[in-house]
From Swiss-Prot:
HAMAP family linked: TmcAL
Originating organism: Listeria monocytogenes serotype 4b (strain CLIP80459)
EC number(s) given by UniProt: 6.3.4.-
Primary site of residence: cytoplasm
Full protein name: tRNA(Met) cytidine acetate ligase
Family the entry assigns: Belongs to the TmcAL family.
GO CC terms: cytoplasm
Reactions catalysed: cytidine(34) in elongator tRNA(Met) + acetate + ATP = N(4)-acetylcytidine(34) in elongator tRNA(Met) + AMP + diphosphate
Length: 390
């Protein structure tokens, strides 16, 4: 069976995702499409708008054959680690092709850029450090400056959000298994972070979440496939944002000592002190980010750091594993064929997982389900089995 892998958040699953999924199957001639999906919290350092099990249902209803969870310790980090670990899981599960959307849309250019970085790794790292010192800027900007300086302006624009992820997928594949074929299509219509829904049927997940959180589900439904609309209408829990967790974060920052926070993943350069001061002044999470912001810290980095503090995520990361959130018959058949040749632990029953392997994931789910209205999902990692569909 020919397998194509995709890396997703489905926050929530919308028409753009449906187009991407259909193209992935069509253009790669895949027998099975496997999605590695973020769980309770997503890469920009935010809670997912609804629980991972509901988003898994959306994925399966739309035609994904298998949904595998990207562990929270990787799903909530910067693009390099996010991509590295997603590709590691897809490689372990033996996908032939990695398919992704990007602003650029030409997979060969991503591969070429990745090869150049691998071949010039020492020079590239040195250029990044020089940019950090000379310009006193964020790591992301220093990375982009170093890339342009060494490889020119025209190779690939890694300032665009999906190009950044695509480049890091290509880099991870180049380092881990260059035989994985890359395939990319250009994103259509909505930009990744567009906050307004301006097109007939395609809008960004950001714009769709904005509508849903404002209670405008009917308006948001114009940009969602029928299967997602049905799941959203049947969902009895709340739609979530940082608003639901702000008081927990505020308490954590006020209660903890500065030295205690130094050991949290992503905390550096004394940023915890700014955060602790802001926590006593901010009225809400948006205020908090504005009060904490500096030239060296992007909003996304601040959100990720705040999330790691909320989750009490220590600097060490967990080991990778394959945690099945859901599958259809095709996915079950594929897993049965390859199970013996998969090098990472496969988890379908959490209670049978190796001791300690899921510790961070379980804590993240428990914190996520503290939000009012999620009582039915508390301890869900234990009592909600993988979702199986015909």
């Amino acid at each position: 069976m020919k397998a194509t892998g995709i890396v997703v958040e489905y926050n929530p699953f919308h028409n753009g995702h449906k187009l991407h999924l259909n193209k992935a199957r069509e253009l790669t001639q895949a027998d099975v499409v496997i999605a590695v999906m973020s769980g309770s919290f997503v890469q920009r350092g935010e809670p997912a708008i609804l629980p991972k099990w509901e988003r898994t249902r959306m994925a399966l209803a739309a035609g994904v054959d298998m949904v595998v969870e990207l562990p929270v310790s990787f799903a909530t980090q910067h693009a390099t680690i996010f991509a590295e670990e997603a590709v590691r899981i897809l490689d372990a599960i033996h996908v032939d092709t990695l398919f992704f959307g990007s602003e650029h849309g030409v997979a060969e250019d991503f591969t070429l850029a990745a090869k150049k970085v691998v071949e010039n790794e020492a020079r590239f790292d040195e250029a990044i450090q020089l940019a950090l010192v000379d310009k006193k800027t964020s790591y992301a900007r220093a990375y982009t400056e170093a890339f342009k300086k060494l490889f020119g302006q025209n190779l690939l624009d890694i300032t665009k959000p999906n190009n950044i992820l695509g480049f890091h997928y290509a880099l991870a594949a180049q380092k881990q298994n260059p035989s994985i074929s890359l395939h990319s299509i250009p994103r259509e219509h909505a930009g990744y972070h567009d906050e307004e829904a301006n097109h007939d049927q395609i809008a960004s997940a950001t714009a769709i979440r904005k509508l849903i959180l404002a209670g405008k589900l009917e308006e948001a439904s114009h940009y969602l496939p029928a299967s997602s609309i049905a799941i959203l209408r049947n969902y009895e829990g709340p739609f979530l944002s940082w608003t639901d967790y702000w008081s927990f974060l505020q308490y954590r920052l006020i209660q903890a000592g500065s030295e205690e926070l130094e050991g949290i993943r992503g905390v550096s350069e004394g940023i915890q002190n700014r955060m602790q001061q802001a926590a006593t002044k901010a009225q809400n999470f948006s205020d908090f980010i504005e009060l904490t912001k500096t030239k060296r810290y992007s909003n996304a980095r601040l959100q990720r750091t705040a999330l790691q503090i909320l989750l009490n995520a220590r600097s060490q990361t967990s080991s990778p594993y394959i945690r099945i959130l859901g599958m259809n018959k095709t996915g079950q058949q594929y897993l049965s064929l390859h199970k013996k040749n998969i090098s990472l632990p496969i988890i379908t029953t959490v209670s049978k997982a190796p001791a300690g392997l899921l510790e961070e994931e379980l804590r993240a789910t428990n914190i996520y389900t503290l939000a009012k209205g999620l009582e039915n999902y508390q301890a869900g990692d234990f009592h909600i089995p993988p979702i199986l569909t015909l």
